[in-house]
Amino acid sequence: MTTSKNPVVLVHGLYDTVTVFDTISTDLAQSGWSVHSLNLIPNYGSAKLEILALQLAEYITHTFPDDQPIDIIGFSMGGLITRYYLQRLEGIKKVQRYINISAPNRGTTIAYSLPLPGIVQMRPDSDFIKDLNQDCQHRLNQIKCTFIWTPYDLMIVPASSTLLGIGREIQIPVILHAWMVKDQRVLKAIKEALLEPIM
């Protein structure tokens, strides 16, 4: 059993860049973690999520040695991108701890507002969501998973769409979706999840 601090990769969401993680990055770095993140391009929904997941996979391959385990945090759309990496690009073999924050894991009705390919994939009835969810229990239960959500989320509708019945599910009553990567209660939950022992 080990509680070593793995490098942490942060994956942002729609319209975001790495700067959305400034608070988390600073907090984790000050607590002894090696923190990494990348800008997904394009970030506004014009590319399918598989394309962005390939960017993530390439970044990880070029950043870490093959034998270096890592932990991943995916926020919002980044939660789906990280899940595709884990479930479809063999990321499950690389990642030991996974934190999914306010992601549309079962889709969000907000995604019906725009017809862009990456946004369409976030609809509750999309083939992308259906595909990821048909084997998520089997795949994600192989690693330590934590799902953090707020019932007040107006971007993930319904807010409970983040939950998959896997791993630890933590409800934190943060008022705004964007504050989920800034709230001190969320930061505390993240650090606790990153310190969970690996068998």
Task: Name each region found by the language model.
Residues 2-7:
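Proline/glycine-enriched tight loop/beta-turn segments at coil->beta junctions
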Residues 40-47, 174-176:
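A short, charged, and often flexible helix/loop element on the N-terminal side
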Residues 141-199:
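C-terminal catalytic-base region of ester-bond hydrolases, centering on the histidine
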Residues 8-14, 19, 28-38, 46-140, ...:
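Serine-dependent carboxylesterase/thioesterase catalytic core
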Residues 23-24:
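Short amphipathic alpha-helix
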